[in-house]
Amino acid sequence: MPAITLPDGSVRHYDAPVTGTTIAADIGPGLARAALAMKVDGRMMDLSRAIAADAQVVFVTRKDEAALEMIRHDAAHVLAEAVQELFPGTQVTIGPSIENGFYYDFARNEPFTPEDLPAIEAKMREIIARNAPFEREVWDRQDAIRFFQDKGEKYKAQLIQDLPDTETITVYRQGEWLDLCRGPHMRSTGDIGPAFRLMKVAGAYWRGDHRNAMLSRIYGTAWRDQKELDAYLHQLEEAERRDHRRLGKEMDLFHIQEEAVGSIFWHKKGWRLYRALENYMRRRQIEAGYEEVRTPQLVDRSLWEDSGHWDKYREHMFIATVEDEEKTLALKPMNCPCHVQIFRHGLRSYKELPLRMAEFGACHRYEPSGALHGIMRVRSFTQDDAHIFCMPEQIAKETADFVAMLASVYRDLGFDSFRVKFADRPESRAGKDEDWDRAEHELREACRLAGVEYELNPGEGAFYGPKLEFVLRDAIGRDWQCGTLQVDYVLPERLNAEYVAEDGARRRPVMLHRAILGSFERFIGILIEQYAGRFPLWLAPVPVVVAPIVSDANAYAMEVVTALKRAGVTWAEADLRNEKINAKIREHSLAHVPVILVVGRREAEQRQVALRRLGSQEQQVMALDEAISALATEATPPDLRQ
């Protein structure tokens, strides 16, 4: 009979299978009221499920982070019930919890509109108030298929048909309504609480395939209490204010147009920002012992077949056929196979390892148009990509050195902290299990020796190896996964990379794939939103504008600009237009220019400037030399400051 071990180490013995509800009640009435679900040996389960064997049990209450996913999952079910009550004949498809919320996809003749959301949300609150219990039922597979087919729910029937034969078919009832679901769920609809809101409608293809029917998706957000909901809604407002697409337009940084969907037209100011970041990263990599290379954009399919990308990644590749040569080429989606070709060009010695090879490599990956998002999710992008060819005993030091470099770069760019996730082997992968065992062991050991603490991200490794994912948190609390480090024994084997070891034998190098920014385009989008367009001088596309009050000061304004440029403030500008000074200040403030130097006759005569910072109404009168020295220091990239 089951022995139930609780988090405090105490053990409760039962003479028969026991439910979580009973255990919680035995512990005390407070827990019986607060418990929403339970973890049984680490697996989330309904409180109503019976435990028949010895197990470790942890109860989940509203205070626990794990409750959020339960609240959102249950809210998705209530959303589906509300829609079917209000819009009979609507078919339900899938409705998962997602980061910060949930959604449900519906099949109906007319898509939902934002105007439908208030009524649906009101109906959801009505269903929650009914406090109907969630009840789990196990059904026969064929009975379940017939049931949903008879209801006209063809998508649910298809989902069941596609499940493995070994999968148990379960449905959950909430009052008179039910849905196909693996669970788990909380006790009742009332446990969801009032802290939710429907956010928007969108279109989505069934199973994400553009060849399938277009469905109507409703997104919502749900939280543990009103305070959390209000904080999230405030974050969304702040995110809208910082949206890189809007700021990019206001600051004249870039644009995107239909003739090149998923690719960026960089304007001169945006390209200045891009180049400032690229030059900074180039210096940091040179300092860390990387050699920069350049590899082709179009590569024959044979290399992608050898590397495994053709099988695992072909649907994301842009492919071209050269008819007169009967060749099939692909725009490279990543740089690693090409870097192996450089490593293989000539006989390598163990004395050359670790060999650190870097490239600001342009890559192309197909993304559905609906998934594209400004410059953050595109089809054509450049990575700060590098590969370290090393021996197994060098992995730990290279990992530690990389993490130290990454942390320093992030600090320079305005991010003081980051989290690390360990992504292990995915279901679809290349290589032998023993190679994966070795790679995962080596990466865990490298993390231990480097003092890197991580959380597990199961099944999210690359198809050729496990990886560390470095997650930034921005100024408004959003997480961005940017940097990566991957350990790869597979690609050197597939592409026949080798070196001569100290004993004269030929050996395979270990390949470490690493990036700090990820893609320049996405990271610049993150930077725009992190700073809300208010860049530090060293990154600002226009760091300083000199604005004369009267035309008599134009010559002095140009002299100031020349002095700034000589001091290293390369993109300083003068605004010599015949406009009132307040209009100039307003215009350049809206363009997020960090510093405006106001000059008039008196400033010209006394060799001074009136310095005005973005967001401030105050002007600081300074000697010209003093101002130039201070601004030149601010405009110097952090890695070049003394």
Swiss-Prot record:
Location(s), subcellular: Cytoplasm
Major place of residence: cytoplasm
Gene3D superfamilies (UniProt xref): 3.10.20.30, 3.30.54.20, Anticodon-binding domain (3.40.50.800), Bira Bifunctional Protein, Domain 2 (3.30.930.10), Threonyl-trna Synthetase, Chain A, domain 2 (3.30.980.10)
GO cellular component: cytoplasm
Location of the TGS domain: 1-61
The EC number(s) this enzyme carries: 6.1.1.3
Residues binding Zn(2+), per UniProt: C336, H387, H513
Location of the region described as Catalytic in the Swiss-Prot/TrEMBL record: 243-536
InterPro entries: aa-tRNA-synt_IIb, aa-tRNA-synth_II, aa-tRNA-synth_II/BPL/LPL, Anticodon-bd, Anticodon-bd_dom_sf, Beta-grasp_dom_sf, TGS, TGS-like
Cofactor: Zn(2+)
Disulfide bonds listed in the record: none
Cofactor note: Binds 1 zinc ion per subunit.
Subunit structure: Homodimer.
Function: Catalyzes the attachment of threonine to tRNA(Thr) in a two-step reaction: L-threonine is first activated by ATP to form Thr-AMP and then transferred to the acceptor end of tRNA(Thr). Also edits incorrectly charged L-seryl-tRNA(Thr).
UniProt-recorded name of the protein: Threonine--tRNA ligase
